[in-house]
Amino acid sequence: MSSLKRSSSAIKGSNEYRSSKSGRKQLRTIRKASGPRRGLAEESANEENNGSETEAEDKLAAPELNEPAQDQRAGGEAYAALLTLLKAEHGGPARRKTKTDDKKTSADPTSNVKDEEESESRDNEDEEEDEDEEAAIENALMDEHTSGDEDDEGDDGSHQDDINGVTREGGDATELAAGFEEEDKPDTLEIHFNSVSEKDTNALDAAFKAKEVRYRSCKLHVDKNQEFIYSRPTLVNEPASAVSAPDGSQSLNSYFIKQRLKIQNDLLDSQDKLTPLQKQIVDPMFQYQDLLYEYEDYDKETEYRDLYALHVLNHIYKTRDRILKNNQRLQENPDQELLDQGFTRPKVLIVAPTRDAAYDILSKIIQKSGLDQVDKKAKFKDQFFQEALPPSYKPKSFQQLFKGNTNDFFVLGAKFTRKTIKLYSNFYQSDIIICSPLGIQLILENTDKKKRQDDFLSSIELLVVDQLHSIEFQNMLHLTSIFEHINKIPQQQHDADFSRIKMWYINDQAKLFRQTLIFTKFSSPFANSLINGKCRNYAGRWKNHRVIFPENSSLGQLGMRTRLIFQRFDLVGKSVSEEPDSRFKHFCSVIVPNIVKSTGYEDGILLYIPDYTDFVRVRNYLREKTTILFGDINEYSEQRQLTSNRAMFQQGRVKVLLYTERLHHFRRYEIKGVKTVIFYKPPTNPEFFEEVARYLGKSAFLGLADLNISVVRCLFSKLDGLSLERIVGTERAAVLTHGPNETYEFK
């Protein structure tokens, strides 16, 4: 298999698919007998019968809230039987072993015990506000039967007249005609999700599970400042061949975009209105390939958010309209096989670091949607928007990250109907879920195992991680947890219509089709681990690499002359996992003796440590194995300790001050009395290198230090190439990491 072959008839044309029709008919019969479908698939039917039928459905649904345990067990067994039947009839892979609870998953998975580390990092959290947030999440996770779609039935009266995404109330014939013309364009959603043969999908899935996938890559040079790397998964037994990047037009005109979105966003003419950044990412985004994009400046966030907001809406509208069309087709011919759904309704998950970022993202989506009615918009603004600004003397990056509402605890659902956006919707009835890593962690990894729930993430087709560089300073494990829980086969049925679920959902292959978009200011090993290790999109992935010239590096922007020493320790014959141990040994054997017998200043030594585990290790060593007088300040220190230790360091009463990167990220202290700086590891953010090194300049200005004697020393290994590149420049970083010398000095 040279590659995954896309064919418009690949699925329906296979004998395996034909053989599954009898099973699908049985499932449709079972499904109809089990109760009403209450979700997107019935919206078009509900619009005509929003009176007496609603009451009848409510009467049918109500008993399910208090069904006995025996019925729940029977339901769970029936759900497992449905999955087994589908796979057996379809000739799919063996049934995936999943745990089915004897009892229905709890409807309110909230945590009564707050993680102490998380609460300490949220300095301004109020306990009553936390309780309100937990209650809101509790309500949003109530089983879908209790928060059905009664409110949808009255405002979706234009379904049949709006099958092409153009509202025809008081209709405009030209808009209708344009809507039909748009369908002549290639639909990348249809191509990506519905045109890959099941044989190829199964082969790639088996290769991933056996760890026999090989990625083949190629580079595209955009200009002298940037290049893109495209990688595609291939099977080990495929013949070696050069990989070429997918064709792209760098224009929205090449893609099928719903007509109402084109009208709302002024995209009807053929004029290209994309910015240079948007032209770089429009093709990977709209062709449903994965993307890790490192942007240059915070001002660029608006540009990529504008584009993915349009992409998200286009995906939701097209997916939803296809289901509504198929509802009508099934009414005309119930024997048709129309596979257009997942297990649950949510299709888009957006992860953001703060409420301010979430407010900006969701506001863009609302503005671009073309819908005027937004339920609970005032509540959304009240809870997510603030006009607060950080002090003007703080660095620009700090002001950008910590403006507005910096609360990092939230999960919010948004549901789209024909005329209305419903915020704070039930998660199982939402189209978009926007969350912080901490907020969704409360649901996915609840301390009470009975309250854990991840079924609402089972059918996510588009995952967006925004401002990853900021999320990395919260808790990376929370973000990793999302990737572990997404696209799993749900443990409960949730009224899924199995006769319409796509087979790659049934076969637990949704991860091969999910698109992941990651945006960050600074690429990092963690970012690479996500795109390389957690994303399995069969369509491949893109990463950009920015070339840093010396004048644009941290050294070029430092603005003062002092000794800058970069000291490398080697990892010959050692694995990546042994790097922290090698760094610590080098620190103990080389750096500590220099501190004890310093030829420069004996005090005023600031030791900057990016990783908290390294900080604890170094602190314990200095405390137990040396007689060095030192103090330490970190992100978990109380305010009294922060003030006291900084004052003693400034007065020279302690010789060394240990300072963590997370504390600097959240506070940006101006530490006084610094005469020597030691970086235990290169900072993740190059701005931090400049800010900390400039402490020496301030001491020199106050007459406390001489820049000819002061030193900035940085430990690094060849694994620190990404961080070094932004500090010294791309070419210099290559010399430092692979050159013959172990020590390099700049001045």
Swiss-Prot record:
Pfam families linked to this entry: Utp25_C, UTP25_NTPase-like
Residue ranges, annotated region (Disordered)? 1-170
Transmembrane among keywords: no
Q: Which InterPro entries match?
A: P-loop_NTPase (IPR027417), UTP25 (IPR010678), UTP25_C (IPR053939), UTP25_NTPase-like (IPR053940)
Q: Which is an annotated GO molecular function term of this record?
A: rRNA binding
Biased composition of type Polar residues is found at 1-12
The answer to keyword Aminoacyl-tRNA synthetase applying to this record is no
List where in the cell it is found: Nucleus, Nucleolus
Q: What keywords are assigned to this protein?
A: Nucleus, Ribonucleoprotein, Ribosome biogenesis, rRNA processing
* Basic residues bias: start-end ranges: 21-35
Q: What are the GO cellular component annotations?
A: nucleolus; small-subunit processome
This molecule's function is given as: DEAD-box RNA helicase-like protein required for pre-18S rRNA processing, specifically at sites A0, A1, and A2.
Task: State the family named in the UniProt similarity comment for this chain.
Answer: Belongs to the UTP25 family.
* PANTHER family reported for this sequence: ORF PROTEIN-RELATED, U3 SMALL NUCLEOLAR RNA-ASSOCIATED PROTEIN 25 HOMOLOG
Q: Spell out the protein name for this chain.
A: U3 small nucleolar RNA-associated protein 25
Source organism (scientific name)? Lachancea thermotolerans (strain ATCC 56472 / CBS 6340 / NRRL Y-8284) (Yeast)
Lineage here is: Eukaryota, Fungi, Dikarya, Ascomycota, Saccharomycotina
